Amino acid sequence: MADDEVKPIVRIADVDLDGHKKVPYALTGIKGIGIRMAYAICRELGLDEEKKLGELSDEEIERIEEEIKKLSEGESNIPSWMYNRQKDYETGEDMHLVGAELEMTVKQDIDRLKKIRAYRGIRHELGLPVRGQRTKSSFRRGRTVGVKKKQ
């Protein structure tokens, strides 16, 4: 397929992706799919990783969409240690969330932490770092935290 026959925009998982990028790099435009997962999807489907996304046939694009759906249901052959949602809080299943579903789930997790007044939830409420970083010299924007300056 010549370069002028490349589809400029390809829609996968409700996201418009650049058809001029190589397949794995284009797939990273979908929220929840990083470069490692994109390569895993390509290898699982037997796609040429050097091909541009716009050069793929409609059938190959359909297969990519089906694989992404399988990931979110936990039915893919990709190992579960690569999933972004292992041992889900409600179901206990391993799944890989993408797009709006991922954003919604993360928001629900944070809201749950806030509701039960967990330390992490309180830090989220206050807009402070959650993962134990120091606040004396970092995260100074917006509010006074840490040590006051001597006068």
UniProtKB/Swiss-Prot annotation:
Region (Disordered): 131-151
GO molecular function ontology, one term from the record: rRNA binding
Biased composition annotated in UniProt, kind: Basic residues: 133-151
Amino-acid biosynthesis listed as a keyword: no
Assigned GO CC terms: cytosol; small ribosomal subunit
Keywords associated with the record: Ribonucleoprotein, Ribosomal protein, RNA-binding, rRNA-binding
GO biological processes: translation
One Pfam family of this chain: Ribosomal_S13
Self-association and partners: Part of the 30S ribosomal subunit. Forms a loose heterodimer with protein S19. Forms two bridges to the 50S subunit in the 70S ribosome.
Family recorded in the similarity comment: Belongs to the universal ribosomal protein uS13 family.
Protein name per UniProt: Small ribosomal subunit protein uS13
Source species: Methanopyrus kandleri (strain AV19 / DSM 6324 / JCM 9639 / NBRC 100938)
